């Protein structure tokens, strides 16, 4: 059996092929839970078809693929039995910075040092004109006292939702570190100049993708998308690719930022910063 962070997953040894690398074994184990979060590297468990991607919880490990021929047979999973204790450490009022943005930066730095996969990935929640909530992951591309920055197609579903209801929520779900950050605020469209400055830093293929994709619109198949990208390559040749008029950034101006740290026996630590009329921040501790 392979014991993960959230439960137990069967890993048949007779159908498991392991790529060569340091600390390779048929039964990879987690490092001791007493490791401090910044030093304990994330253990990932993802699958694509019959391939499972595992990363060692110890520093310096390489990613390895496990082929599991029995995955097609399906699993009998008892979801109500998935549980674990949170032991990474507590969070105190004295340990928090007076500025929530600075505290976000501290936790982001620790998430990066822990080699988490996509530490800047954040769940963006919106509500459309019909009141339907939607969530998706976007990447944090800027952080300052002014707010949290991400970029997208202005004709996407998320952009239309923001136009109707600019109040949004962001979530940084760092499960391995037993941490969450929840941000509530208002999304504002950034200037064309700011968006262009960032667009110029993107890899060329990412620039092409921004032009090629009519984000959130139906498409016949993958081949059609690839052809649209090829058409853009031919259109611009070897020249510079300008910023599309339909693409740009949003800045989420925070009014509320909550920090959550998992605690033993589900007695978690929660602190919320709320912005006052004077521009200062008030800090409160919340019950879990």
Residue ranges: model-predicted function:
Residues 2-14:
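Extreme N-terminal basic, low-complexity initiation segments
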Residues 6, 21, 37:
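Short polybasic linear motifs
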Residues 67-288:
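Binding-site signature for planar aromatic cofactors or substrates
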Residues 14, 27, 39, 47, ...:
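Intrinsic-disorder-associated, low-complexity terminal segments enriched in Asp/Asn/His/Tyr and depleted
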